[in-house]
């Protein structure tokens, strides 16, 4: 055992762990405290979800990573006030003064990230329009974004291609829809959840993704006042509500 551990240690010090097996001599009780930051895949979507609330949200244990900084910048150009909380890693997100943003500002903050597509549902509810910059390959006809756009159209959104990106409007508001995804896409499932929670009527989503971050996003939306149930066989039902509150 000791020789294997020493071998792994030497390998790790030089070029990284290269052995295909590591023997651990257990039996020694472990104790202590570690700080666990929020999961990236959930934190950024929770930040976007704050746009749906009519009161501020408090998000705890936010990791200081590039994706979080991108979403923070996008929220701020849309008028959301983002401030540090009392504890390290706390963010307070206040959407009271949400407003439309210029395409150039969205593009500057988004970089190559596709996160702006998830802003569409919340912004359509709040402002009646949303913009997606040309993200280099993120275009109509590109399958990943097409799933999002097709879902938004099912809710009643109108999608227009502009030289600088995509403009999405909801001239008659958003209404519940029956949607079946071509495959259980995590991003498209998040899109439907973020859009359906305040759409009029009931949305039935079939072939939904059911990864842990989806369940966590559902829990956050439910905490805000959304009515969502997860059924067998990858079916999610969402009953739209008129208003949502912030989460803590």
Where are these regions (language model features)?
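Structural preference for solvent-exposed beta-strand-turn elements
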Residues: 1-248
